[in-house]
Amino acid sequence: MALYMVVENFRNGDALPVYRRFRDHGRLAPEGLSYISSWVTESLDRCYQVMETENRALLDQWIANWNGVVDFEVHPVIVSKEAAEKIAPRL
């Protein structure tokens, strides 16, 4: 399973449309895309979210469901233990 750090920039810095859509429709994630956790800035204009999937296309499908209220940045990430193992031979 691949992990993705998703940075959600709420359109016009406005969290209301985002939370209304979430309240009314839920996360809108397709089957096979799993929500891990998220953190929202105190200013309520940005969310940092970790998602997991084997199929990157599912992430794009989920992003399309939020079109109009959120601008996305997607970064593939690995856990710290895996990063340490990956860099160890070069130390």
Regions found by a protein language model. Name each.
Residues 1-46, 54-58, 78-91:
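Short S/T/G/P-rich N-terminal loop/turn motif that feeds into the first structured element of a domain
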Residues 17, 60, 71-73:
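A short, polar/proline- and glycine-enriched secondary-structure boundary/capping micro-motif
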Residues 49:
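Extracellular/luminal beta-rich ligand-recognition
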Residues 63:
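Short, flexible helix/strand-to-coil boundary loops that buttress conserved ligand/catalytic motifs
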Residues 66:
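Short, conserved SAM-binding/catalytic segment
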Residues 69-80:
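Conserved short beta-strand edge segments in small beta-sheet-based binding/regulatory domains
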